[in-house]
């Protein structure tokens, strides 16, 4: 895998007219046994920044426990704190036909289903030089999407806060019940380095345009 335990990546999030709307950190916390599965433990945390924070106080954390072999999701945890409202949820994803493990009520999903965070790391694991397209079911805790990823450019220069990099450009489109989700699309650039570091994400969503860029060299 291109990522390693202990990896921490920090990003600056720009939204609408706000160049520093939020800070995002992505972390490969550990490899661990979860109910008999060998898993990667991924974590993403997002915190709104001033002046946006005066309008939208957001402190969210997402944890993904992803199979080390198949990269399908076994457990997805959401710890949301948004504008005074808190919500914690633990989702135990079980492929149809398999038995549940543990005491958490299972969510039955198609084999190979990822959660959003685990899916992002799965995109890093792809060899985009030899796999131009990748389709995967993604469950976000509420809705199930068919995510279709495609290589748009094998190599191009990308400038972010962390520096200038050669990168592969990937487009992401979301489908639900066979129809493309309107006004929602993503572009992602992965560096041409052994870690395939995510450098930049451009998102078009109903809430507006979002730019997420690597803020500093990985550590």
Tell what function each PLM region has.
Residues 1-94, 128-219:
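Acidic, serine/threonine-rich low-complexity disordered tracts
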Residues 83-126:
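Hydrophobic, well-structured mid-protein blocks that either form specific transmembrane helices
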């Amino acid at each position: 895998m291109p990522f390693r335990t202990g990896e921490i990546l920090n990003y600056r999030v720009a939204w609408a007219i706000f160049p520093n709307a939020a800070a995002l950190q992505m972390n490969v916390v550990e490899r661990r046994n979860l109910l008999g599965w060998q898993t990667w433990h991924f974590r993403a945390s997002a915190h709104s920044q001033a002046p946006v924070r005066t309008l939208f106080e957001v402190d969210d954390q997402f944890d993904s426990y992803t199979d080390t072999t198949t990269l399908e999701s076994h457990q997805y945890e959401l710890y949301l704190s948004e504008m005074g409202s808190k919500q914690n949820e633990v989702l135990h994803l079980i492929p149809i036909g398999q038995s549940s493990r543990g005491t958490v009520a299972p969510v039955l999903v198609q084999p190979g289903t990822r959660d959003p965070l685990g899916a992002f790391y799965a995109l890093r694991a792809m060899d985009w030089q030899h796999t131009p397209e990748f389709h995967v079911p993604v469950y976000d805790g509420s809705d199930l999407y068919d995510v279709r990823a495609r290589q748009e450019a094998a190599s191009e220069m990308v400038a972010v806060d962390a520096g200038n990099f050669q990168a592969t450009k990937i487009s992401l489109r979301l489908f639900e019940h066979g129809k493309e989700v309107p006004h929602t699309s993503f572009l992602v650039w992965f560096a041409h380095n052994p870690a395939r570091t995510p450098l930049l994400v451009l998102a078009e969503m109903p809430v507006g345009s979002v730019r997420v860029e690597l803020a500093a060299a990985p550590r």
